[in-house]
């Protein structure tokens, strides 16, 4: 009964994530709009020198599975295939020098902006995750260890916490793979609960890019692939970020 109700509550349609989607989808001339290469997007997104804190680094709370699989993927980055993505406290830090189009940037004097999945600052208590991206294959792997502050059913991660991280990983992958910026839809089917403090591996793939949209899929499962936690699909709108003016 718990599983049935869990699956019923978990249906998400038109979930908005990285930024809220505008009501009207702008039409653009595709031949000229999306000229940024994956390499240039990755270079901007992953600065080599920065004073910003990277939250996607190992800490004492990581379980042995999380640590060992992290090391495996870190080794794969040396061959030039995979890239470890840094994770700063806000997406504003990832897109420095750029602004949202159509005046969507909000004006505020608040300084402590935080990405939802980086809002819990205590190590091991909330989201512990790291994303690896493969540019040529347009896919990502996210290693996720939910902490006790993400609990839903006693001892297990809330379904919404997984949904949020799926959307976050989708958004990063969509942007780097094809300048995908807004979540148009996110559909999830939950299969099993994730124990708090354990590792879940999210495999995300760009299925196709068509008609100004990126179509993507994700499966969240245990490291040995014997337990599937959830499957999802997402659609993202391609929308090019604008250069900020020198006066800003």
UniProtKB/Swiss-Prot annotation:
Q: Give the EC number(s) listed in the UniProt record.
A: 3.1.2.2
> Which terms in the GO cellular component ontology are assigned?
mitochondrial matrix; mitochondrion
Q: Where does this protein reside within or beyond the cell?
A: Mitochondrion matrix
| Keyword annotations | Fatty acid metabolism, Hydrolase, Lipid metabolism, Mitochondrion
Which residues are the active-site ones? 167
**Any GO molecular function:** long-chain fatty acyl-CoA hydrolase activity
What PANTHER family does this protein's entry cite?
ACYL-COENZYME A THIOESTERASE THEM5
Q: What interactions and quaternary structure are annotated?
A: Homodimer.
Family label:
Belongs to the THEM4/THEM5 thioesterase family.
User: What is the name listed in the Swiss-Prot or TrEMBL entry for this protein?
Assistant: Acyl-coenzyme A thioesterase THEM5
Origin organism lineage: Eukaryota, Metazoa, Chordata, Craniata, Vertebrata
This protein's encoding gene? Them5
């Amino acid at each position: 009964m718990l599983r049935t109700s869990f699956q019923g509550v978990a249906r998400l349609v038109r979930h908005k994530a990285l930024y809220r989607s505008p009501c009207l989808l702008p039409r653009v001339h595709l031949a000229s709009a999306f000229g940024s290469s994956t390499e240039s997007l990755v270079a901007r997104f992953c600065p080599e020198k920065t004073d910003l804190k990277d939250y996607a680094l190992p800490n004492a709370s990581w379980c042995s599975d999380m640590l060992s699989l992290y090391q495996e993927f870190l080794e794969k980055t040396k061959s030039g295939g995979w890239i470890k993505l840094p994770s700063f406290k806000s997406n504003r830090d990832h897109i420095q020098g750029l602004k949202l189009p159509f005046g969507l940037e909000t004006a505020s004097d608040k300084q402590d902006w935080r990405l939802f999945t980086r809002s819990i600052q205590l190590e091991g208590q909330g989201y512990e995750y790291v994303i690896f991206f493969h540019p040529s294959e347009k896919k990502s792997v996210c290693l996720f260890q939910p902490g006790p502050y993400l609990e839903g059913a006693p001892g297990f991660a809330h379904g919404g916490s997984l949904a949020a991280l799926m959307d976050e990983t989708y958004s990063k992958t969509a942007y780097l793979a094809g300048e995908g910026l807004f979540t148009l839809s996110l559909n999830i089917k939950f299969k099993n609960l994730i124990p708090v403090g354990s590792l879940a591996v999210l495999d995300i793939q760009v299925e196709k890019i068509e008609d100004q949209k990126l179509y993507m899929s994700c499966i969240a499962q245990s490291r040995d692939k014997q337990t599937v936690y959830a499957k999802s699909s997402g659609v993202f709108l391609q929308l090019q970020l604008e250069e900020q003016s020198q006066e800003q």
